[in-house]
Regions:
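Cysteine-centered catalytic environments shared across enzyme families
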Residues: 1-80, 84-136
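Short, solvent-exposed loop/turn segments at secondary-structure junctions
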Residues: 84-85, 109-111, 135-138, 188-193, ...
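Short secondary-structure boundary/capping segments
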Residues: 96, 120, 145-149, 195-214, ...
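Extended catalytic-interface subdomain
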Residues: 143-201
Length: 346
């Protein structure tokens, strides 16, 4: 209840367990064993900022180029906001020559996200549609049978269903604005993978040698950001129980815990294995529910392998990511004349 997702391989049922991200089960006769074939935790490689900037540009272009080659002429639908990630998707597709692309946004016409998304779409020469949402329209939708059917469809027993944009995809389908074989591509989850969730306190604490102090700092940051949905549940008892479970999961999955340069990796590993893979990614089920395919280029294997080796000082405040976007200026939509939404890291 404090987060909307479970920790580890637990579910809401006592004797039912799930696989964690990057994990398989191998059965042999009457026995079985869990094997983690991938973890978002790597060896930090120290290179110059310029070298990393060049590599990130190449990796990003390569990922989208290969994806576009496989998609071919199929229609691409982009949920576009004023943030970096969906703008990257739209602008790099334009840079690579993709033509069969539509963008949409939702909310009120005077919303900052909507205004900027419209400007971006116009500059890229991509068709754009606003889906106006009101309290009344959303109240009607969330009381509908369709919404209840989606809850059953998307149940995983380890996370609450992701429902943001559910009504908007249905709206677009109902007005026949989307081809039946269209592919949705959103920006999940560029902000996390590029360092946008790392608090400056992680940097300050990582300069210390005391593992207990650093451990407490990492766990406190995780709880503050991801386990604070209900303030009245943040009792000392609940927080202490959370810390034990979170730290056990980190110790089980990560090596070199004593190394203070790995503090941000421990923090990101925990978010990756729980919140990102259980809750955030489940939002893709929305597209599946209405019969559409999707792609997640910013979760591509190449991106994971790249970002897990980047030093902390290049990831703080998304320094490397943002510099790459501005330097390449895909689609000419990365100037100061088209502002990015402001997000506060807590």
């Amino acid at each position: 209840a404090m987060s909307g997702f479970v920790i580890g391989n637990k579910t809401i049922y006592k004797n039912l367990h799930s696989l964690k991200a990057g994990e398989i089960v191998i059965f042999q006769g009457n026995s079985y064993e869990y094997l983690q074939y991938y973890k978002y935790f790597g060896e930090i490689i120290n290179k110059s900022f310029e070298d990393y900037l060049k590599e990130l540009s190449e990796v990003t272009l390569n990922i989208f180029r290969k994806m576009l080659n496989k998609i071919g002429d199929r229609q691409i639908i982009i949920p576009l906001s004023a943030g970096n990630d969906s703008r990257l998707v739209a602008s790099i597709l334009k840079h690579l020559g993709a033509k069969n692309v539509k963008c949409y946004s939702y909310g009120t016409p005077e919303n900052f996200e909507v205004k900027i998304a419209k400007i971006i779409s116009q500059k890229l020469d991509y068709e754009w549609k606003l889906i106006p949402l009101t309290h009344k329209s959303e109240k009607i939708f969330y009381a509908s049978k369709d919404y209840k059917k989606y809850l059953d469809y998307s149940e995983t027993y380890c996370s609450v269903p992701y429902i943001q944009s559910l009504s908007t995809v249905k709206y677009l389908k109902n007005i026949n604005w989307i081809n039946d074989d269209a592919i949705f591509i959103n920006g999940n989850t560029g902000d996390f993978i590029s360092g946008g969730h790392i608090n400056l306190n992680i940097l300050d604490a990582s300069k210390l040698e005391n593992i207990e102090f650093r451990k407490e700092n990492i766990l406190s940051q995780l709880i503050e950001k991801h386990f604070s949905l209900w303030g009245y549940l943040k009792t000392d008892l609940n927080k202490n129980n959370l810390k034990v479970n979170l730290w056990n999961e980190i110790v089980e999955g990560c090596s070199d815990i004593q190394k203070n340069s790995n503090d941000h990796l421990l923090y990101e590993y925990s978010e990756f294995i729980d919140r990102q893979s259980k809750y955030v990614i489940s939002g893709q089920r929305i597209y599946e529910y209405y019969g559409y395919n999707w792609r997640l280029p910013l979760w591509n294997d190449e991106y994971l392998l790249f970002w897990q080796k980047v030093p902390l000082n290049y990831k703080l405040k998304q320094k490397l990511y943002i510099e790459m976007l501005k330097k390449n200026n895909f689609g000419n939509v990365w100037g100061d004349d088209i502002p990015v939404n402001k997000k506060k890291i807590t």
